[in-house]
C-alpha cells in the first residue's frame, strides 16, 4: 500500500481514520521490509538501497543498506524543481514580537544554499558535528537544513541553556562550529546568547574555532574577530 493512496475526507470521521491506521500498522508489522520499501519510493534517492532490511545479525539491524539520500533535497529542493518554489515552506509566527512571516520554498532554498556555502568555506564537511544553539526562528531551520545539505551532523541545544550545561554538550559532541543568534526572547525579557556561548567555550575542554552568529535587532552581540562571523 503506497502512503499517498490513504486519503480520508473530514466527513468520514474518526472510525474510518482508525480503520486505515490499523490497516497500515498491520502492513508494517507483518512485512516491515516491504512496507518501508514502498514508503521509500515517495522520496528521492541519490543511490537506491540494495537491501531494504539486513536482519542477519539481530538485534543489530541495518536499514536501506547501500542507499544514499539527502534530507535537505527532499525537504526543499525537490519542491522547487517540481515548480512549487512560490509555495509557502515556513510560516514564522511570533506572538512575542508580533511578527508573521511566510517564507517560500525558493527563498528557503536560497538561504540554505548560502548558509551551506559558509559552512563549507569554513571547513565543515561530511560527518563533522555542528551545534545549533538558537531560538525558534527561521534561521534555526536554515542552519539544520544547511548541515543536512552537506552531510554534517547537527546537534540542537536548547537556546538559553546555562554556560556550564552548554559546555558539557560541547565536550560530548566535539563540534567544529556553533551556529547561534545574538539573543532569544522570552515574555518580558531578552536573553543574550553570546555571553553564554563565550563562557561555555571558555569552560569546555574542546575548543571551537568557528562561531556563526545571526544578529537580531533587539540585542546585538560583540564579535570576536578571530573566531566569530555573521550569518546574513
Task: Please provide the spans of the model-predicted regions.
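Conserved AMP-binding/adenylate-forming core of the ANL superfamily
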Residues: 72, 90-145, 162, 166, ...
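Adenylate-forming
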Residues: 28, 76-80, 108, 112, ...
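Solvent-exposed alpha-helix faces
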Residues: 33, 113-117, 171
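Structural core segment of the AMP-binding/adenylate-forming
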Residues: 145, 149-232
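AMP-dependent adenylate-forming
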Residues: 53, 75-103, 215-223, 229-230
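Glycine-rich phosphate/diphosphate-binding loops that line cofactor/substrate pockets in enzymes
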Residues: 81-83, 119-122, 168-176
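Flexible, non-catalytic linker and terminal segments flanking ANL/adenylate-forming cores
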Residues: 6-75, 79, 214-215
